[in-house]
Amino acid sequence: ILPTGDGMALVFFNSVHAAFKCAVDVGKKTYKHPQIGLRNGVYSGPVVPVKDINNNPNVSGSGINMAQRCMDAGDNDHILISNGVHQYVNQMDIPGLKFEDWGQVIVKHGSTVHMWTAYGPNFGRTEFPTWRGTKKAEFKSE
């Protein structure tokens, strides 16, 4: 667990399944408490442990950066995952688990990430993020 100012990052070095299950489990616990304002982004990529300028534990790498981009694309209660994560977790045995393909989402610096939203009866959401404007403006056409 790494503090990030007004949030935190949970880093899983060895299991994309564990990272995704954690996002779902936390989503279930906070689903009925919208005042918490939690968004989840899950991405699988290189992450290495480092020390920050104050010698505190931290991580670096595209994995943590892209997980942040996935999270930033959502509203409260979204569980947004990259296409690579979806390929690993789409058959997990989680009651009611469903996915919606959002395609190529434009993120920071104009780059794109193929994202899916994960949801179920008491976690996640499918609605397009209200703060991002229209779907057409934020998604790259295929």
Predicted feature residues:
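An N-terminal, helix-rich hydrophobic module
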Residues: 17-21, 39-48, 52, 60, ...
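Cytosolic regulatory/linker segments at or just downstream of nucleotide-handling modules
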Residues: 76-141
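Secondary-structure boundary motif
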Residues: 28-32, 72, 91
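Aromatic-enriched hydrophobic runs in primary sequence
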Residues: 12, 38, 73, 116-119
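Catalytic core of nucleotidyl cyclases, primarily class III adenylyl/guanylyl cyclases
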Residues: 1-21, 25, 29-63
